[in-house]
Amino acid sequence: MPKKIHQPGGSLYCGVTLLGVLCLVVFRLIPGIPFGTYVMAERDHYHTIDDPNVPCNFYDTVNLTGHRLFPNGSYDYYGTIVPAELVGTYDYIHSSLTERIEVREHVRGCVCKFKSCLNICCPWRQVFNSEVDGCIIDHSDNRTWPDPPMLNITFRNESTILVNMFTQFAIQSFRPCPKMFSLQPETNNWDDYLLFENGSMLRVDDKLLIRKNEFCMVPTYVNESDMFYTIHPANCDMQDDHSTVKIINSYAMMFSIPFMMLTIAVYLLIPELRNQHGKSLVCYLIGLSVGYSSLCYVQLYQVDATGVTCKVFGYTAYFFFMGAYMWLSVISFDLWHNFRGTRGINRFQEKKRFLFYSLYSWGIALVFLAFTYCAQQLTNLPANLKPGIGDGVYCWLDMSNWAAMIYFYGPILAIVVANTIMFIMTAIKIHGVQREMARIIASENSTKNLRTEKDKRFYRAWSNYRFGLFLRLFLIMGITWLTELISYFVGSDKGWSKLFYISDLANAMQGFLIFMLFVMKKKVKHLITNRCSSVRDGSNQRQSQYSTKTTSSSVANLSLHEKPSVEKPLVISSSVDPQKTTIFR
């Protein structure tokens, strides 16, 4: 008897996958390693509101201490009236995009919620001094400051107008990063930039759109002999320690997408896998792959946030992500439904049920898309209640306020909770069925129920397979999304929030994990081998049929070209089988 060849099991692939994820996380945490040119600080988590008791996040506020207070609770901030409902008490400040410092309580106003803000690195007429690591008034500096400072601003109609910085914008004073460099287009052509009316900036050389709180305006000069300052933007240093989160996650998603495509192909081409679970998994992966592709495009190619392309990719990503989450709930429900002990259904009923699932998943995703689009484009809701897709700053959802909870994380939270409940109920049911079967097999009447040892082994294998399917689905599609939600609520300004880099990366690599756990299994690889063998055998059979057809046709053509004879009537070979020819075609 030949020796049985043992192939690598699922545990080995899981170990390799986990090792790869951990290596990527460690690589991401190494400081000073940029991915691409001019990578920016991580862009989503620092937009979350730190304290639910304040009206907006810190980066949309200005310090109102010392400014005029009106009886109705509003403030006058250099001619801009900040209403009372947008005024709050803060006991912290941010010294950079990722560092929070506790300070004495002071009043701040959300002026950026109703007027475009522009950030200056230091209070006006102060300069940054690296020795004291702060802003100072340099009395030895005799250079002249522009009064008033004039800037070329590009508006939505693509016109560029020279405007007074202080009248066009509400001025913030904040240094986004410890290490920064200024753009100087007078000396470097690659330092050209465009400032937009919403306070964002486009760096022309690499087409990078930078948000208002990711850069600041700074006084610059070209030569030491210059006696006047010119105002230009300063960017975060491309080797900032926190600069690679979004970039590495985007590349992880790009790495994951081909594995999703391979998994989809396997489950569509193998007949044994085209059951209800397989088709639901394919639909989930289609939604996830299109969503990942759209998100990678807007993050890596820096699409103009004011253009139509930005909106198209943003809403496309939103629709397919929501569709994927709906299919996630379908998978959980169908798994729970199958373990309830319901009677089997025929093929027609299965197709009907899949059609219902499809209408449910894509239909609800379409409803969410319509609701989100109307909220952004067709309503006069406050800016902090709009999703932010294609608003001139974001191509994806605006994570700077709790509106993201309404349009994205809220529905996901509901789905994850429902899925977790169904997973727990399914686990309880599986455990109960396994105990019952163990009792039956051990009983004296087991021969009446499972008459052969082969039947017993088959049911044990089936039960273990179902439990393994349940466990894989729960780990990949339940735990990872749950940690993503926790990561959103926690934010990234806490020291231990770096732990969520692992879950973020696991989510980005979900396609790779699914491929390893659902395709690189012994049974599935065996089905793939059988499928390839059957296709190869079918090809050989068709080639044989084609050879027979060619020979018969040659005889027929020879007979047709011969001159008919009375003594020898025309005979055309009947060996060409019309049915076989049709099959070949």
Swiss-Prot record:
Residue ranges, Extracellular compartment? 33-250, 302-312, 375-404, 488-498
Which sequence ranges are listed under topological domain Cytoplasmic?
272-280, 334-353, 426-466, 520-585
What sections of the protein cross the membrane? 251-271, 281-301, 313-333, 354-374, 405-425, 467-487, 499-519
Q: Does the keyword Cytoplasm apply?
A: no
Task: List the PROSITE patterns hit by this protein, alphabetically.
Answer: G_PROTEIN_RECEP_F2_4
Disulfide bridges in this chain: C56-C110, C112-C117, C121-C216, C122-C135, C177-C236
Q: What is the effect of changing M150V?
A: In strain: ZIM(S)24
A Pfam family annotated for this chain is Methuselah_N
Q: How does it sit in the membrane?
A: Multi-pass membrane protein
Identify the glycosylated residues.
N63, N72, N142, N152, N157, N198, N223
User: Which terms in the GO cellular component ontology are assigned?
Assistant: membrane; plasma membrane
Going by the UniProt record, its keywords in alphabetical order are: Cell membrane, Disulfide bond, G-protein coupled receptor, Glycoprotein, Membrane, Receptor, Signal, Transducer, Transmembrane, Transmembrane helix
Q: Name one GO molecular function term.
A: G protein-coupled receptor activity
State its location(s).
Answer: Cell membrane
Tell me the GO BP annotations in alphabetical order: cell surface receptor signaling pathway; determination of adult lifespan; G protein-coupled receptor signaling pathway; response to starvation
Lineage top rank: taxon: Eukaryota
Which residues are the signal sequence here? 1-32
**Would I find Secreted among this entry's keywords?**
no
Checking InterPro entries in the record gives: GPCR_2-like_7TM (IPR017981), GPCR_2_secretin-like (IPR000832), Methusela_ecto_dom_1 (IPR044860), Methuselah_N_dom (IPR010596), Methuselah_N_sf (IPR036272), Mth_GPCR (IPR051384)
Q: Which family does it belong to?
A: Belongs to the G-protein coupled receptor 2 family. Mth subfamily.
Q: What is the protein's given name?
A: Probable G-protein coupled receptor Mth-like 10
UniProt lineage: Eukaryota, Metazoa, Ecdysozoa, Arthropoda, Hexapoda
Q: Per UniProt, what is the name of the gene that codes for the protein in this document?
A: mthl10
